[in-house]
Amino acid sequence: MSSLPKTDFNVPKYQLIAQKREANAAEIEAALEVVREFIIKKKLILYGGIAIDYALHLKGSSIYPEGERPDFDMFSPNHVEDAYELADLLYEKGFKQVGTVRAIHVQTMRVRTDFVWVADLSYMPSNIFDTIPTLTYKNLKIIHPDYQRAGLHLAFCFPFDNPPREDVFSRFKKDLQRYNLIEKYYPIPVVPVKSTYENKTFSIPFKRVAIHGFAAYALLYQTLNELRMTCKVPEWKTEFPQPSYSYHKNDKNITLTVDMPKAYPSLVLATYNPEEIIKEMGLHLTEICEPYMDYSPPIFKTKDIHFFSTMFKELAISMIQDNIIVVSPQYLLLYFLYGAFATPADKALFLFYYNATLWILEKADSLLNIIQKQTSPEEFMKFANTSPFVLTTRVLRCSQDRCTFSPAYRISLANDVQQSQLPLPKTHFLSNFLPDISTLPYNYYPGKGKDRPTNFSYEKNLLFNIGGKCTQLAM
């Protein structure tokens, strides 16, 4: 029986050929050049895959083949007006079917010409935009890979986000490859920071919260140490923090005693409904912080405990010891990056703990390799699937049948309610959480003869309050 001839399945190669042979290829390339000049003129900051690719070009590497059409994703502190302005510019230069529309991601506007997307503009509050680190590639500002790491960790933290193309299926592999390239070419230097610790004791409900922050680091470190002793590996010499903890629990609560840095003595927990937990624990809410982009959710602070809200999302978690719930290492890494961005005075401390968490994962991987050699494939898979050190799809469940309600889903539901004029039943879980769609940016099509919309306000829509601002509450 004759065999089929070997075929070259170089997908990127044929994608480039297909792009060049498109009927409107010349028009698209011309439009992208207009976009490029617009980005340079407005000093906008590229992010996403193109920013990673350009940063890698500076190191002699890449993630995209040479000559691939750029996919311009950019941050702007005034993204709605900038999107409208770019649409007007393209229309004035003779491009057809120009428009700008709201993207699925609510803080993003998409600009198209001839039904081809040529730019995505995403909102970044000016207090963040003016301070984030950047690099320059061919006169274009690109977000620094240190900041880009946060977006890559984020996908691993919420595996069921963005249905029906959940991140676990659509992003895990791609983002892991990109992260490894960033770590290879732009590692964060290890700069030891000496910390003074104090022994703190907290009593918390263990079934509905995940331990986070510096306490989670302590639990993960000691879990690693126990795994090391099980594998009979000599103790490692390390400059990274080695905090200890102890606990006891009953049917409802866990009493946790843990070494905490004196600079950050508050316990951090992640939970689906922080206000309900705070009320049940008899605590007094003292401060509320708005989200910091996508990298930190709303934070509800009490005197000794800070609650990170995971409402509408399913957070990946790990289980250690006697079914104690801790956040996944990826969420912990994201927390330390967020701390470095949001609190410049303690940037060195947070980056030291970030590298310490990476070290934990590196050592855990070496121990898992030992276990794999000593056990059957079935036994190893069972062990690895319960390990707190690997990527996981185990999530912190909410009290509803479904937990993942993205802003896009809630906006779509609000549109349906408005068009049908049939309000949701008061008993519906989302009845009090539908956004006011009249406060969202309007789509704009310059060729239709209508004036550019002018009534959008960032302040009037909570979905755009993502600058991390904290508000103290009256006692």
UniProtKB/Swiss-Prot annotation:
Induction text: Expressed in the late phase of the viral replicative cycle.
One Pfam family matching this protein: Poly_A_pol_cat
Enzyme class: transferase
EC number(s) given by UniProt: 2.7.7.19
A molecular function (GO) term: poly(A) RNA polymerase activity
Main location: virion
Keyword RNA-binding: no
Compartments, as annotated in UniProt: Virion
InterPro entries: PolyA_pol_cat_su
Known catalytic reactions: RNA(n) + ATP = RNA(n)-3'-adenine ribonucleotide + diphosphate
GO cellular component, one term: virion component
GO biological process, one term: mRNA processing
Highest taxon of source: Viruses
Keywords, in A-Z order: ATP-binding, Late protein, mRNA processing, Nucleotide-binding, Transcription, Transferase, Virion
The keyword Acyltransferase belongs to this UniProt entry's keyword annotation: no
Sequence similarity: Belongs to the poxviridae poly(A) polymerase catalytic subunit family. Highly divergent.
Primary role: Polymerase that creates the 3'-poly(A) tail of mRNA's.
Name the UniProt record assigns to this protein: Putative poly(A) polymerase catalytic subunit
Annotated source species: African swine fever virus (isolate Pig/Kenya/KEN-50/1950) (ASFV)
